[in-house]
Amino acid sequence: MMKFAVSSKGNAVSDSLKSKIQTYLLDFGLECDEEEPDIVISVGGDGTLLYAFHKYSGRLDKTAFVGVHTGHLGFYADWVPSEIEKLVIAIAKTPYQIVEYPVLEVIVRYNDGSDEARYLALNECTIKSIEGTLVTDVEIKGELFETFRGDGLCLSTPSGSTAYNKALGGAIIHPSIRAIQLAEMASINNRVFRTVGSPLILPEHHTCLIKPINDVTFQVAIDHLTLLHKDVKSIQCRVANENIRFARFRPFPFWKRVQDSFIGKGE
């Protein structure tokens, strides 16, 4: 028996749809299981799906996600409220295709040797200093690439390349490409200090290591979660071994989503 969970944005419209979806799926004989679902239906927007991703990040190999957007077009959500009955029937009766997207692994290590902190990001990780300019060495594949001075760094996944990364002038990458992207935030470039000044696309197995020059407190944002880290030795970023799995019941082309989100359908 398939087990499901429904995650809601928490507003009246989303909560009403959540209740309706739960009732319909239970009527079809599916089991509601908030702890170990086979499929998670996210009702809201992209933020709701990010929340669901982090809630179930420990079982990404066993759980698939599908999104229903109740506001503006959701980049991860391909169903609208008027299609709820159709979606429920598809979940209950139709074998679905699994589409996997890469995610970002972030490991924070500390100078005192205490246990490292590991995170997964669906969209991006941003790294800033709360004490002014961020000054860090950036290593790629174990070799020093540059010393960065500026407001911060953004490391994004392909599916997250349309978010903060795009605002920084980064490229939009198709999620079939297993890579991460490193983009700079307001880097300092003059005759003394130089950075590459362009976004970098790092393929799978290319690790980016960010090592602070001075003793600062880092503000590390993992998607919507903002965390402070002190006494940091390094922050390691790479394509994670895990993937997020989406349940697809119909085509949902990536470039069509990009077009709808940023260009529109035109006249």
Swiss-Prot record:
EC class: transferase
Coiled-coil regions, chain positions: none
Example GO BP: NAD metabolic process
Enzyme nomenclature, EC number: 2.7.1.23
One Pfam family of this chain: NAD_kinase_C
Record's GO cellular component terms: cytoplasm
Transmembrane segments: none
GO molecular function: ATP binding; metal ion binding; NAD binding; NAD+ kinase activity
Protein's UniProt keywords contain Hydrolase: no
SUPFAM superfamilies xrefs: NAD kinase/diacylglycerol kinase-like
Record's keyword terms, sorted: ATP-binding, Cytoplasm, Kinase, NAD, NADP, Nucleotide-binding, Transferase
Cystine pairs: none
Active site: 46 (proton acceptor)
This protein's record includes keyword ATP-binding: yes
Entry binding sites for NAD(+): 46-47, 123-124, 149, 151, 186
Family the UniProt entry places it in: Belongs to the NAD kinase family.
Protein name: NAD kinase 1
Protein's organism: Bacillus licheniformis (strain ATCC 14580 / DSM 13 / JCM 2505 / CCUG 7422 / NBRC 12200 / NCIMB 9375 / NCTC 10341 / NRRL NRS-1264 / Gibson 46)
